Amino acid sequence: MCDDDETTALVCDNGSGLVKAGFAGDDAPRAVFPSIVGRPRHQGVMVGMGQKDSYVGDEAQSKRGILTLKYPIEHGIITNWDDMEKIWHHTFYNELRVAPEEHPTLLTEAPLNPKANREKMTQIMFETFNVPAMYVAIQAVLSLYASGRTTGIVLDSGDGVTHNVPIYEGYALPHAIQRLDLAGRDLTDYLMKILTERGYSFVTTAEREIVRDIKEKLAYVALDFENEMATAASSSSLEKSYELPDGQVITIGNERFRCPETLFQPSFIGMESAGIHETTYNSIMKCDIDIRKDLYANNVLSGGTTMYPGIADRMQKEITALAPSTMKIKIIAPPERKYSVWIGGSILASLSTFQQMWITKQEYDEAGPSIVHRKCF
């Protein structure tokens, strides 16, 4: 299928925070840009500047000082379809420079998403972009493909949603899927809040992007939260400095590990939910007793919010505490896990056995958007 660029499938992983897009068969996405649409807050006065009424992705990011930034995908669910269409248009025509009507397109979504969401995705792909064929795959399943396994439990945590999906011999076990609407964006918001306690005020949508950068560069997961808090209180060894875009330097201490600790203790942001170690355990316990051993031994991490240093060791420690004492527990944290959903999509869309799985334009015309529930698990 990949002998020429004419018929190569496109793989587009629409995350709440980043869009990862490229061609099936490639080993990494060609385009990675923020899922942001920005609109000017001010009136344009310079004639001939060619100001636009909206900016997408990196361009919106670079002009953020004069824009209001909006994310069309919240908690993995597309909430603003007009903006989402702009993002897809930008992906096809500006980033990948392809005509979507010539390429089958694989999209991704979070498990347990509303049915209407995938129907609308299908409808826009066929009716607005005229793709010849498309498919919607579950993100966590693709991550498992990328790790070269058919059995395991995936903890996929991105910017908008975190979920545990147990998969056995290639089958996702829907009754055991755990979904947690707490992910990278909530951690960024929490970091904004606790930095305010230090006297640094971050409020606007543009400043949130600065805090996200602080989080990505400096945050880490503590192996033992109480110990780490004590260390931070007694010495300044954990403090790091960060230079803001205007040259001001701020110092950040225990916020570095208090921020991602929320994943293990959602009560930090007032959520009643269990932490990611407990949802993983609960998900395994909802599976058949015979397959739990294989799941414990194949805990695969995926998504940008699993990129914190120390997260794998902490997961190992927490799950070991919950599991039976003789159980062998292994956490797999591939270095490329930030993009493993996309990589899995690239693998899937280039398999010869997958080619009969596409929803074709003809099938869509006959059955309408609801075909997506029959063809895509």
From Swiss-Prot:
<feature type="modified residue" description="Tele-methylhistidine">
    <location>
        <position position="75"/>
    </location>
</feature>
<dbReference type="Pfam" id="PF00022">
    <property type="entry name" value="Actin"/>
</dbReference>
<dbReference type="GO" id="GO:0005524">
    <property type="term" value="F:ATP binding"/>
</dbReference>
<feature type="modified residue" description="Methionine (R)-sulfoxide">
    <location>
        <position position="46"/>
    </location>
</feature>
<keyword id="KW-0514">Muscle protein</keyword>
<protein>
    <recommendedName>
        <fullName>Actin, alpha skeletal muscle 3</fullName>
        <ecNumber>3.6.4.-</ecNumber>
    </recommendedName>
</protein>
<comment type="similarity">
    <text>Belongs to the actin family.</text>
</comment>
<dbReference type="GO" id="GO:0005737">
    <property type="term" value="C:cytoplasm"/>
</dbReference>
<keyword id="KW-0007">Acetylation</keyword>
<dbReference type="GO" id="GO:0016787">
    <property type="term" value="F:hydrolase activity"/>
</dbReference>
<dbReference type="InterPro" id="IPR004001">
    <property type="entry name" value="Actin_CS"/>
</dbReference>
<feature type="modified residue" description="N-acetylaspartate; in Actin, alpha skeletal muscle 3">
    <location>
        <position position="3"/>
    </location>
</feature>
<keyword id="KW-0488">Methylation</keyword>
<keyword id="KW-0547">Nucleotide-binding</keyword>
<comment type="subunit">
    <text>Polymerization of globular actin (G-actin) leads to a structural filament (F-actin) in the form of a two-stranded helix. Each actin can bind to 4 others.</text>
</comment>
<keyword id="KW-0206">Cytoskeleton</keyword>
<keyword id="KW-0067">ATP-binding</keyword>
<feature type="modified residue" description="N-acetylcysteine; in intermediate form">
    <location>
        <position position="2"/>
    </location>
</feature>
<keyword id="KW-0378">Hydrolase</keyword>
<keyword id="KW-0558">Oxidation</keyword>
<keyword id="KW-0963">Cytoplasm</keyword>
<dbReference type="InterPro" id="IPR004000">
    <property type="entry name" value="Actin"/>
</dbReference>
<comment type="function">
    <text>Actins are highly conserved proteins that are involved in various types of cell motility.</text>
</comment>
<dbReference type="InterPro" id="IPR043129">
    <property type="entry name" value="ATPase_NBD"/>
</dbReference>
<dbReference type="InterPro" id="IPR020902">
    <property type="entry name" value="Actin/actin-like_CS"/>
</dbReference>
<feature type="modified residue" description="Methionine (R)-sulfoxide">
    <location>
        <position position="49"/>
    </location>
</feature>
<dbReference type="GO" id="GO:0015629">
    <property type="term" value="C:actin cytoskeleton"/>
</dbReference>
<feature type="modified residue" description="N6-methyllysine">
    <location>
        <position position="86"/>
    </location>
</feature>
